[in-house]
């Protein structure tokens, strides 16, 4: 068993030169229990299948306009009062935020390896899966900048996160017939 697929996604949340990305995936399976050499063992093991898969997806959920140099408007209590008299506060705009012009998709790669076993004519089934998920290019603050600059570091695709785990399922599916 073999399956391959791919996605070509675009998002307006990124600069035009990084808007589009390709995300491939595939899986392979081998049902050993259907092979001729395994037939003698089917008395003990009704089903034996090995599985593996790998896939990459993209994450565009980074916030709006993260790649544009925008200025923040301060109003109300955050306005300045030293320009006028009394309790009057005036709106003002802050310094443009720093941006990374190469901001792009976070990519999430998942690897999965598994085995399916069936016993007692598939009344008892055991499934085991091991997986690893790695997120590359996570949005994170960039290198620290001198405080005299007056702006915080631009966010960039600098982070990585890896999770690993396993899953074991055991189930019994016997059908009892009415004795009447």
Features from the language model and the residues they span:
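Extracellular/periplasmic, surface-exposed regions of secreted and cell-surface proteins
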Residues: 1-180
């Amino acid at each position: 068993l073999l399956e391959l697929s791919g996605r070509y996604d675009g998002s307006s949340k990124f600069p035009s030169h990084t808007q589009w990305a390709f995300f491939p995936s595939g899986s392979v399976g081998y049902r050993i229990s259907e092979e001729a050499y395994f037939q003698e063992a089917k008395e003990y093991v009704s089903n034996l299948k090995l599985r593996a898969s790998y896939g990459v997806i993209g994450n565009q959920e980074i916030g709006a306009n993260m790649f544009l140099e925008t200025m923040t408007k301060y109003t109300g209590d955050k306005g300045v009062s030293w320009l006028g008299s009394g309790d009057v506060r005036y709106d003002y705009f802050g310094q443009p935020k720093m941006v990374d012009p190469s901001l792009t998709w976070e990519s999430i790669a998942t690897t999965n390896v598994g085995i399916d076993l069936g016993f007692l004519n598939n009344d008892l089934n055991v499934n085991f899966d091991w997986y690893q998920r790695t997120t590359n290019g996570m949005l994170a603050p960039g290198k620290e900048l001198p405080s005299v600059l007056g702006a915080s570091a631009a966010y960039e695709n600098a982070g990585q996160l890896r999770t690993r785990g396993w899953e074991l399922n055991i189930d019994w599916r016997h059908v009892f017939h009415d004795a009447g």
